């Protein structure tokens, strides 16, 4: 839809009168310049909720600064905590994918849902000014609390583990099949430790880990000692001789919270996610041909009372005509004129 045209502006105004929420991510002030700001749209619809998601918010000195997902992660603080501590001079790195945009979208959604709940008992809508920079700055895990409260320290990057204000034991262990496991809390309880040492001893690789001092460490959950570092290195050598899945399954059997470092696509082959939990689902795409479907990531939760269903996203302009006909009572002739004049597209 051409929202710069008078006809497009009128369509937006008409739709805003009958909708619950308006989402937008234009530059600050752009919709107001077209007469489509919240003040105008809510004039005859005080229950309307409108959420604007921008890089730095609608006001302040950064209001008109440009940004990208990478900038959001850099200025928000996430990149400062991501990287390596075993490569001298290594720079911070960004997480894979558009995490900055996802974080911003989640916060925008949470604010919108909160406004909907408030409207349920107040009858009032409101305008939500969401900032990607502020969303990312609010999602730095331990970094901000560690700096704001005693001992008021900055976190530093640690390879394959949480950034922290003090060094923690290296958790990445390589396996014989060139995979990695996250291994930690080896002294979490005595029974698990004894069972782990017995398993290692079956393969002749327990060395002296059956000594009483290590049992005492497990019983007392002792960590951060030279003996603990030594035990971890013995375990690391043992893990290097075993396949990743074997160590993972056995560690879970022994009640250790370890896990395999998987690529996203490896989860597609795990029946726990694909078959038992239904995490992945096939969605039909009839617009591409008969019996054409693709596998998508599903929902990360199961509604027991209202089972979910999934379908493909609408095509661009796929529902434009239907909405104008049914919701705004436009005639077919009027819609055809809007199409021919380039105000809207239909699919």
Question: Language-model segments: what does each one mean?
Answer:
Residues 169-254, 258:
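Aromatic-enriched alpha-helical interface/lid elements that frame and gate functional surfaces
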Residues 18, 32-187, 191-198:
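Active-site-adjacent "lid/gating" segments in soluble enzymes
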Residues 1-14, 72-81, 292-308, 313:
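Redox-cofactor-proximal catalytic regions of oxidoreductases
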Residues 253-307:
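A glycine-rich dinucleotide-binding beta-alpha-beta segment and adjacent secondary-structure elements
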Residues 1-43, 240:
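A structured beta-alpha segment of the ubiquitous adenosine-cofactor-binding alpha/beta core
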Residues 333-347:
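Amphipathic terminal alpha-helices
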Residues 93, 289-337:
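Flexible, small-/acidic-enriched active-site or ligand-binding loops
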């Amino acid at each position: 839809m051409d929202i710069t045209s008078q006809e497009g502006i009128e369509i937006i105004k008409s739709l805003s009168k009958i909708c619950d929420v308006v989402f937008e991510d234009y530059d600050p002030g752009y919709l107001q310049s077209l007469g489509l700001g919240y003040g105008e749209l809510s004039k005859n619809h005080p229950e309307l909720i409108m959420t604007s998601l921008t890089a730095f918010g609608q006001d302040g000195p950064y209001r008109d600064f440009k940004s990208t997902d990478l900038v959001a992660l850099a200025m928000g603080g996430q990149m400062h905590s991501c990287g390596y501590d075993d490569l001298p001079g290594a720079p911070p790195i960004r997480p894979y994918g558009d995490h900055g945009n996802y974080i911003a979208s989640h916060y925008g959604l949470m604010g919108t849902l909160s406004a909907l709940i408030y409207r349920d008992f107040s009858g009032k809508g409101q305008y939500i000014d969401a900032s990607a920079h502020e969303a990312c700055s609010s999602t730095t895990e331990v970094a901000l609390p560690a700096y704001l409260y005693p001992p008021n320290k900055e976190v530093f990057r640690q390879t394959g583990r949480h950034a922290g204000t003090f060094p923690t034991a290296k958790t990445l262990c390589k396996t014989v099949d060139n995979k990695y496991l996250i291994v930690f809390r080896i002294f979490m309880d005595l029974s698990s430790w004894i069972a782990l040492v017995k398993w290692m001893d079956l393969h002749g690789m327990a060395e002296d880990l059956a000594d009483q001092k290590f049992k005492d460490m497990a019983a007392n959950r002792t960590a951060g000692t030279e003996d603990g570092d030594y035990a971890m290195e013995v375990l690391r050598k043992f893990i290097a001789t075993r396949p990743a899945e074997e160590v993972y399954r056995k560690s879970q059997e022994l009640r250790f919270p370890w896990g395999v470092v998987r690529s996203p696509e490896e989860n597609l082959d795990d029946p726990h996610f694909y078959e038992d939990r239904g995490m992945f689902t096939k969605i039909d795409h009839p617009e591409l041909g008969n019996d054409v479907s693709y596998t998508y990531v599903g929902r990360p939760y199961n509604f027991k009372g209202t089972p979910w269903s999934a379908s493909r996203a609408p095509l661009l302009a796929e529902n434009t005509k239907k909405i104008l006909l049914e919701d705004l009572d436009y005639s077919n002739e009027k819609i055809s004129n809007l199409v021919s004049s380039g105000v809207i597209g239909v699919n």
